[in-house]
From Swiss-Prot:
Described purpose of this protein according to its UniProt entry: Converts GTP to 7,8-dihydroneopterin triphosphate.
Classification via Pfam families: GCHY-1
HAMAP family: GTP_cyclohydrol_B
Disulfide bonds: none
The reaction(s) this protein catalyses: GTP + H2O = 7,8-dihydroneopterin 3'-triphosphate + formate + H(+)
Taxonomic placement: Bacteria, Pseudomonadati, Pseudomonadota, Gammaproteobacteria, Alteromonadales
Protein name: GTP cyclohydrolase FolE2
Gene name of the record: folE2
Signal peptide: none
EC number: 3.5.4.16
Length: 306
C-alpha cells in the first residue's frame, strides 16, 4: 500500500490572508533552442526565473514544482518563439488550478554568433548577452527584450587635434611650398610621422525593447541591424588588412556618445513591432578615468523600470 504524504499547502490555514503579485523560482538552468538566420537552432543554457501571481487570498501558496515541470516540458523541448513563450505562460497559469491570473518568465543567456572579418576570409565568434522578460496578466501579454552591443568609438575632438598636430608637424618638417609626394609619404609612414593619434575606446549600447504583444524578433538579424546602425562593431579574428579596414571605419564614423545615441534612436523609431525602448550608450573613455554616457527612451517608457 502506498504511503500518503502530507501536503501542508492545502491542509493548513493561512495566518494572514492576502494576494501576492509574484511567487516563483529564480536561477533555474534550462536548455533552450534559439532560431538562427537560415541555420540550425543554437542550443544555449538560459538562467530562468519563473513566477505566477497568487490571486487567491486564502491559499497557503502556489504549486511551485509544477512551474519547474512546465519549463522543462516547453522551453526545454520547443524552439524559442513568441508561440512557445505564450504557450508556456498559459500553461503556467493553468497549472495553478485557479490560484493565478498571471505568469512571468525571465530568460538570460549568451548568444554566440559567427562573425567574418571585414576583408579577409578569417572569422571568429562573439558572444552577446540577451535577456527576455515576458509576462501574461489577465490576457494581456508584455515582452521586454534586452541586449548589449559592443563597438568602437573614436573621439571627433581628439581626431581633429591629431590632424592639427600632423599638419603642424608637416609645416615644420617641410619648409618649401612645393613638397615632394614621395618624400612626404615616406615621412608620414616613418616613425617620426606618427605625430599624434586620436583616442578611441571600446563602447557599449545597452538596449531594452518593449515588443508589440508577444512578438519576438529574429535575434541574429536584430544584432546585425544594430551593429550596422552604429557602424563600428568590434571584430573577432583579423589580419592586417582587416585591422586597417577597421581603422578606416572608425575614421569614417567619428562619434561622441550623443552621435551613437542618435543613430540608435533613429533605428529604433523605425523598427516595427517595438512599442517602447530604453537604451544607454557608454563610451569607456581612454582619455579619462570616467565613462561618457547618453540615455534615451520613449515618452511612455519608464526610465526606472525599463
Amino acid at each position: 500500500m502506498g504511503m500518503t504524504l502530507p501536503d501542508i499547502t492545502s491542509s493548513e490555514n493561512v495566518a494572514s490572508a492576502a494576494p501576492l503579485k509574484w511567487v516563483g523560482m529564480e536561477g533555474i538552468t534550462v536548455p533552450i533552442q534559439v532560431p538562427m538566420s537560415g541555420e540550425v537552432p543554437a542550443y544555449v543554457n538560459a538562467k530562468t526565473d519563473v513566477y505566477v501571481s497568487l490571486d487567491k487570498s486564502d491559499a497557503k501558496g502556489i504549486h511551485m514544482s509544477r512551474l519547474f515541470l512546465k519549463l522543462n516540458d516547453i522551453l526545454g523541448t520547443e524552439l524559442l518563439s513568441s508561440t512557445s513563450l505564450t504557450a508556456l505562460l498559459n500553461e503556467l497559469i493553468l497549472s495553478q488550478q485557479g490560484l493565478s491570473q498571471g505568469a512571468k518568465v525571465n530568460l538570460d543567456f549568451a548568444l554566440t554568433l559567427r562573425k567574418k572579418a571585414l576583408l579577409s576570409n578569417e572569422f571568429g565568434y562573439q558572444s552577446y548577452p540577451i535577456g527576455i522578460s515576458t509576462q501574461l496578466v489577465k490576457g494581456v501579454a508584455r515582452t521586454v527584450l534586452s541586449l548589449t552591443i559592443a563597438y568602437s568609438s573614436t573621439c571627433p575632438c581628439s581626431s581633429a587635434l591629431a590632424q592639427q598636430a600632423l599638419s603642424d608637424a608637416i609645416s615644420q618638417r617641410f619648409d618649401d611650398e612645393m613638397i615632394s609626394k614621395s618624400e612626404l609619404t615616406q615621412w608620414i609612414t616613418s616613425k617620426t610621422g606618427a605625430v599624434a593619434t586620436p583616442h578611441s575606446q571600446r563602447s557599449y549600447a545597452y538596449i531594452k525593447l518593449t515588443l508589440d504583444g508577444d512578438a519576438l524578433p529574429n535575434l541574429p538579424e536584430l544584432i546585425t541591424l544594430l551593429e550596422t546602425t552604429i557602424g563600428t562593431p568590434v571584430q573577432t579574428a583579423v589580419k592586417r588588412q582587416d585591422e586597417q579596414a577597421f581603422a578606416k571605419l572608425n575614421a569614417e564614423n567619428l562619434m561622441f556618445c550623443e552621435d551613437a545615441a542618435r543613430r540608435l534612436k533613429r533605428a529604433l523609431e523605425r523598427k516595427e513591432n517595438v512599442l517602447d525602448y530604453w537604451f544607454k550608450v557608454e563610451h569607456q573613455e581612454s582619455l579619462h578615468a570616467h565613462n561618457a554616457v547618453a540615455i534615451d527612451f520613449k515618452d511612455n517608457a519608464d526610465e526606472d523600470t525599463m
